[in-house]
Amino acid sequence: MVSKEAIAAARAAYDIEAQCITEMKDYFDDEQFAKAVELLSSAPRIGTAGCGHSGIICQHMAHLMCCIERPARFISPAEAVHGATGFLQPGDVMIFASRGGKTKELLPIVDICKAKGVSIITVTENMESPLAQAADVVLKQHVNRETDKWNAQGTTSTTALCMIFHALQAAVIEQTGYRAEQFALIHPGGAVGERLNNKAL
């Protein structure tokens, strides 16, 4: 039988993450966010990179951009220093996600981006970190605490990162005038595709 403590921990997780999203609005920087939206709306290509949980959410961000026809791909930090950064060209944008802002695997990619004329957007909690200092745009990843009792698992921090990426996509949709009809063409599958293509919006 599942313990009362286990159920209590599960319920507390909802409260912790809901509180985090509410608090994040206090850290929303209109100027920095607007710069990020402008870059993402005009860049020929978008790269994303992160390690661990941040890397997984960066894969999600690349897909979010592709879903509104902003060409994007996740660039594995392991592959980035073995030629994968050839995807990036002058005028492109690279998004780095690192809660601490010091992820060593990402730092060589920064140097490549700088040399190639690629703009950098960094999402981090540490605004004084190397990745933040190297960026053209920095977005604050506020985290109240992780949901596990040790405050160590990548839980609330991934929710915070997702929230920022979701907000960016919503803004880019508005900025570029992307239409439901365009999305319907590239998303014919599933319930979403059926709804869009039947124009039951």
Task: Give the location of each predicted region.
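An N-terminal, well-structured beta->alpha segment
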Residues: 2-42
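Internal, active-site/partner-interface "lid" segment
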Residues: 133, 147, 173-201
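Alpha-helix boundary/capping residues
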Residues: 40-43, 95, 190
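Conserved active-site and cofactor/substrate-binding residues in soluble primary-metabolism enzymes
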Residues: 12, 16, 28-31, 35, ...
